[in-house]
């Protein structure tokens, strides 16, 4: 598999991958909280006498999916704000990403609220090529509205990626210094988060 990020003015930052079955390149367009996969010819990027020559960078598989997760989170969470009134992507999402270590953890961190708070579904993540491990991590960290918080935490704890990301998520949510005013509901929520954090840190 081959992965690229285009750097020309028109398609700057857009991701391209080689579809082995069709033996053709597809560009992923992400805008207006939607994504699409379209065929793209890379011939102009290889011809020295064109403006597009060499206007791309090669990405590893890890770099590609990390950047794809970042772009999806940024677009699909657009217009949302966190409890501190800060842009959701640059605030909460980025803090959670910075709180984990591995590339897989960071990918799940970027996507950890997409199934609950955006129109993205796990089927979309499958279509976009994310690994089963990453998709399951996102599913496990997404709370089903019908399940209790206790059952939810059990599910999170059973998946290593979901657990690592949830600990980072809780760490950010417990930081009351980011709030302009601290209400009683915030204090109650903090106690809930502290108990959840302790539970997830405990070794079974």
Residue ranges and their predicted role:
Residues 2-9:
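A short beta-strand micro-motif
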Residues 5, 52, 58-59:
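Residue-level detector of beta-propeller blades
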Residues 9-12, 32:
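Glycine-centered tight beta-turn/hairpin loop motif at sheet-sheet or coil-to-beta transitions
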Residues 12-15, 82-83:
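Short N-terminal binding/cap micro-motifs at the start of the first secondary-structure element
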Residues 16-53, 105:
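Acidic, low-complexity, intrinsically disordered interaction modules
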Residues 60-204:
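Active-site helical microenvironments for divalent-metal-assisted chemistry
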């Amino acid at each position: 598999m081959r992965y690229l990020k285009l750097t020309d003015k028109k398609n700057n930052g857009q991701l391209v991958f080689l579809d082995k079955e069709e033996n053709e390149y597809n560009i992923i367009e992400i805008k207006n909280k939607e994504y699409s996969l379209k065929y793209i010819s890379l011939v102009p990027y290889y011809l020295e006498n064109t403006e597009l020559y060499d206007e791309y960078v090669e990405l590893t598989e890890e770099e590609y999916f990390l950047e794809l997760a970042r772009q999806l989170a940024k677009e699909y969470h657009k217009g949302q704000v966190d409890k501190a009134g800060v842009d959701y992507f640059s605030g909460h999402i980025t803090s959670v990403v910075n709180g984990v270590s591995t590339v897989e953890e960071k990918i799940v961190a970027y996507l950890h609220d997409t199934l609950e708070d955006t129109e993205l579904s796990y089927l979309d993540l499958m279509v976009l090529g994310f690994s089963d491990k990453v998709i399951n991590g996102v599913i496990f960290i997404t709370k089903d509205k019908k399940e209790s918080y206790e059952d939810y935490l059990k599910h999170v704890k059973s998946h290593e990626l979901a657990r690592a990301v949830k600990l980072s998520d809780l760490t950010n949510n417990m930081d009351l210094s980011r709030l302009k005013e601290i209400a009683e509901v915030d204090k109650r929520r903090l106690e809930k988060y502290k108990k959840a954090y302790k539970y997830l840190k405990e070794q079974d």
